[in-house]
């Protein structure tokens, strides 16, 4: 499903609500992550992207955040991510290579 250059990036964010724009930034950052990946916890997303998609997503996220108040973390799990992710718990595991049912 994904090319050889696809990689898994784990994205976590913390958006400040100290100013009125905080909720707007939060919605926009979450929407950008949802456009490229799957929410696995409230403010954590797994995104399987190729380098071009990652460049677009990262640019979009950085342009939405307030660098003085918000925090984004990117964890690059690379192309061999399948061997690096283990799921334990009640929620079903997300399989980005599985079938998509609409």
From Swiss-Prot:
Gene3D superfamilies: 3.30.70.240. Pfam families: CRISPR_Cas2. This is CRISPR-associated endoribonuclease Cas2. GO terms for molecular function: metal ion binding; RNA endonuclease activity. Forms a heterotetramer with a Cas1 homodimer. Homodimer. Disulfide bonds: none annotated. Mg(2+) binds at residue 14. Keywords: Antiviral defense, Endonuclease, Hydrolase, Magnesium, Metal-binding, Nuclease, Plasmid. The gene is cas2. It is an enzyme of class 3 (hydrolase). It comes from Nitratidesulfovibrio vulgaris (strain ATCC 29579 / DSM 644 / CCUG 34227 / NCIMB 8303 / VKM B-1760 / Hildenborough) (Desulfovibrio vulgaris). Its cofactor is Mg(2+). One of its GO terms (biological process) is defense response to virus. Belongs to the CRISPR-associated endoribonuclease Cas2 protein family. Its EC number is 3.1.-.-. CRISPR (clustered regularly interspaced short palindromic repeat), is an adaptive immune system that provides protection against mobile genetic elements (viruses, transposable elements and conjugative plasmids). CRISPR clusters contain sequences complementary to antecedent mobile elements and target invading nucleic acids. CRISPR clusters are transcribed and processed into CRISPR RNA (crRNA). Functions as a ssRNA-specific endoribonuclease. Involved in the integration of spacer DNA into the CRISPR cassette. InterPro entries: CRISPR_associated_Cas2, Virulence_VapD/CRISPR_Cas2. PANTHER family: CRISPR-ASSOCIATED ENDORIBONUCLEASE CAS2, CRISPR-ASSOCIATED ENDORIBONUCLEASE CAS2 3.
């Amino acid at each position: 499903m994904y090319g050889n250059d696809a990689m898994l990036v784990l994205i976590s964010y913390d958006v400040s609500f100290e100013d009125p724009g905080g909720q707007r930034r939060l919605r926009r950052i979450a929407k950008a992550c949802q456009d490229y990946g799957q929410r696995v916890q409230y403010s954590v997303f797994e995104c399987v992207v190729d380098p071009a998609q990652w460049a677009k997503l990262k640019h979009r996220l950085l342009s939405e955040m307030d660098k003085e108040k918000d925090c984004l973390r990117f964890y690059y799990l690379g192309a061999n991510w399948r061997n690096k992710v283990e799921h334990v718990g009640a929620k079903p595991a997300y399989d980005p290579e599985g079938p998509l049912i609409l």
